A protein has these predicted regions:
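Amphipathic, hydrophobic secondary-structure cores in small proteins
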Residues: 56-65
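Helix N-cap motif at beta-to-alpha junctions
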Residues: 35-36, 75
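N-terminal first-folded block
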Residues: 1-34
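Solvent-exposed, charged/polar functional surfaces in cytosolic regulatory/catalytic domains
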Residues: 16, 49, 88
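Solvent-exposed alpha-helix faces
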Residues: 44-45, 87
Length: 91
């Protein structure tokens, strides 16, 4: 479990992430794809990273779109681990 970030730390961490937002205490981004199977492949990649980090997001899989939502439940808010996960799936 990590330390909950302050609002200033959250704002600073968001600067390095394109199109991510904070919604109801979650770090969220919707990723768009050319077809459904591309989205499924992306979700699989997210799952692999989540297992490696032992930090698991919520994934909403829709036609040509996957929405990723993450926070550190054990800490009760956003931590550096959430932003590290976001950075890894962007890479």
């Amino acid at each position: 479990m990590g330390k909950i970030l302050t609002s200033e730390e959250v704002a600073q961490s968001l600067e390095g992430l394109e199109s991510w937002a904070i919604v109801e205490g979650q770090l969220i981004k919707a990723f768009k794809f050319g077809d459904y199977l591309e989205g499924i492949a992306f979700a699989g990649r997210c799952g692999k990273i989540a297992e490696e980090m032992n930090h698991h997001p919520d994934l909403l899989i829709q036609w040509r779109k996957v929405t990723v939502s993450i926070s550190t439940h054990s800490a009760g808010g956003l931590t550096a681990l959430d932003f590290e996960f976001a950075d890894k799936i962007e890479g």
